[in-house]
């Protein structure tokens, strides 16, 4: 029994299947963890969702910003951008089934035995694990309810960008969503910066990558995340695993076998013909 962690798939179905074949992933025996952003930009978002859904209890995933944007398009809130290549998914006969399944997926995965936490963008250093759990549940409850379009319409935006237990309503939900799915850089006090996308070496002072700011979760747990392809899986402290290596941009799809920390990569089938972008407003 092995646990495989794979970075952002972004609709790269062929690469995902090739990578799982390479590691001899066996559903029912092994477990697959996915860092979110299953869809958009690659050509196979429909096949990715169908396959991941079919894995049942053999998969543990978290939602990413592109997944949330897809749900907003599905709900009629945001427009379908051609570059996201989502039309085959949105027009599929099983679209309702797939997307209603998708909106019931979590923002946070935790394995206490492995001391492993996974979120799409990471864990803000302003949270301890209990707070992260409670915050994830808040958004998950709204997404799985009948009022989810109201939340999706309000999730776009950069404020508030500083955590407070006193946050309420849509502002609280927006901060939680941004922290779990869009975060890259923080100010030294942990306040989110939602504008900078440079490499850590090029970021303006005093910004630091979220994982470079001490936080209570990273003190006790390993953290796996995706979202930040320009890191190329490098430059993180011990116990912090950056798994998005830009498959949809012409990079690779990366898999970490947890038990022995061995990495496997599958080269992209695409040329790097576009720069990194985001579907959710950043």
UniProtKB/Swiss-Prot annotation:
CDD domains: MPP_ApaH. InterPro entries: ApaH, Calcineurin-like_PHP_ApaH, Metallo-depent_PP-like. GO terms for molecular function: bis(5'-nucleosyl)-tetraphosphatase (symmetrical) activity. Gene3D superfamilies: 3.60.21.10. The keyword Hydrolase applies. It comes from the Bacteria. It catalyses: P(1),P(4)-bis(5'-adenosyl) tetraphosphate + H2O = 2 ADP + 2 H(+). Keywords: Hydrolase. Its EC number is 3.6.1.41. Pfam families: Metallophos (PF00149). Belongs to the Ap4A hydrolase family. NCBIfam families: apaH, PRK00166.1. Hydrolyzes diadenosine 5',5'''-P1,P4-tetraphosphate to yield ADP. Monomer. This is Bis(5'-nucleosyl)-tetraphosphatase, symmetrical. The gene is apaH.
């Amino acid at each position: 029994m092995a646990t495989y962690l794979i970075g952002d798939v972004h609709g790269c179905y062929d690469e995902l299947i090739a990578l799982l074949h390479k590691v001899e992933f066996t559903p029912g025996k092994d477990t697959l963890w996915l860092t979110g952003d299953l869809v958009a930009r690659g050509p196979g978002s429909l096949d990715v969702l169908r396959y991941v859904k079919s894995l049942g209890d053999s998969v543990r995933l978290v939602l990413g910003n592109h997944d949330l944007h897809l749900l907003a398009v599905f709900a009629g809130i945001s427009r379908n951008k051609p570059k996201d290549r989502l039309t085959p998914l949105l027009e599929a006969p099983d679209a309702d089934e797939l997307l209603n399944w998708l909106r019931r997926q979590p923002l946070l995965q935790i394995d206490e035995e492995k001391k492993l936490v996974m979120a799409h963008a990471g864990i803000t250093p302003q949270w301890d694990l209990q707070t992260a759990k409670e915050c994830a549940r808040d958004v998950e409850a709204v997404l799985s309810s009948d009022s989810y379009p109201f939340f999706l319409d309000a999730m776009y935006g950069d404020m508030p960008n500083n955590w407070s237990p006193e946050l309420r309503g849509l502002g609280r939900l927006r901060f939680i969503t941004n922290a779990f799915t869009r975060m890259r850089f923080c100010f030294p006090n942990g306040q989110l910066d939602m504008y900078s996308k440079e490499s850590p070496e090029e970021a303006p002072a005093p910004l630091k990558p979220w994982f470079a700011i001490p936080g209570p979760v990273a003190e006790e747990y390993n953290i796996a995340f995706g979202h930040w392809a320009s890191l190329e899986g490098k430059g993180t402290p011990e116990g912090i695993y950056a798994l998005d290596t830009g498959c949809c941009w012409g990079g690779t799809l990366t898999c970490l076998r947890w038990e022995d920390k061995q990495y496997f990569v599958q080269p992209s089938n695409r040329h790097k013909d576009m720069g990194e972008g985001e579907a959710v407003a950043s």
